[in-house]
Amino acid sequence: MSRKCEICGKGVVYGVQYSHSHRQSKRSFAPNIKRVKAIVNGTPKRVHVCTRCLRSGKVQRAI
């Protein structure tokens, strides 16, 4: 499954996870991506969209 929003381009970000004793390990932060049916150029199409774009109304859902 794609880990990138097709509307805003938000994708995976890499960082560091710290334990209580401050030991470090690398980890990734993935966006909350949903596969929704949306209107794209007048036709319904399945797209990968982050929940921020869904909540803000940047995507017109197809029924």
Curated annotation (Swiss-Prot):
Short name of any one Pfam family annotated for the protein: Ribosomal_L28
InterPro entries: Bacterial_rp_bL28, Ribosomal_bL28, Ribosomal_bL28/bL31-like_sf, Ribosomal_bL28_bact-type, Ribosomal_bL28_sf
Gene Ontology cellular component list: ribonucleoprotein complex; ribosome
BP terms from Gene Ontology: translation
UniProt keyword terms in alphabetical order: Ribonucleoprotein, Ribosomal protein
UniProt GO MF annotations: structural constituent of ribosome
UniProt superkingdom: Bacteria
HAMAP family: Ribosomal_bL28 (MF_00373)
Family recorded in the similarity comment: Belongs to the bacterial ribosomal protein bL28 family.
Stated name of the protein: Large ribosomal subunit protein bL28
Source organism (scientific name): Clostridium botulinum (strain Hall / ATCC 3502 / NCTC 13319 / Type A)
